């Protein structure tokens, strides 16, 4: 069984290292972490979603019928859980 939280956290930190190396790396992403304050910008999130698509085999933002823009890590994680293949 996939541990989405673990996979997303690992990938999130990889992207953060590439796009914002001065920002701290997260041991754990808290559910209430505001994505705008996370250290990733819009390009970073695009890279994150693309890498997760490669690793998980799906992009929930392409699958969903109505666009949803998560504001917290919990909302981001839930989007992946709801659309999990």
Where are each of the predicted segments found?
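Phosphopantetheine-dependent thiolation modules in NRPS/PKS and related acyl-activating systems
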Residues: 1-39, 44-47, 54, 58-85
């Amino acid at each position: 069984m996939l541990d989405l939280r673990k996979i997303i956290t690992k990938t999130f930190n990889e992207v953060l290292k590439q796009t914002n190396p001065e920002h701290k790396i997260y041991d754990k992403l808290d559910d209430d972490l505001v994505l705008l304050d996370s250290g990733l910008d819009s390009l970073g999130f695009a890279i994150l979603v693309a890498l997760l698509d490669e690793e998980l085999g799906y992009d929930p933002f392409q699958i969903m019928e109505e666009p949803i823009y998560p504001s917290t890590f919990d909302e981001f994680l839930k989007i992946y859980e709801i659309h999990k293949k």
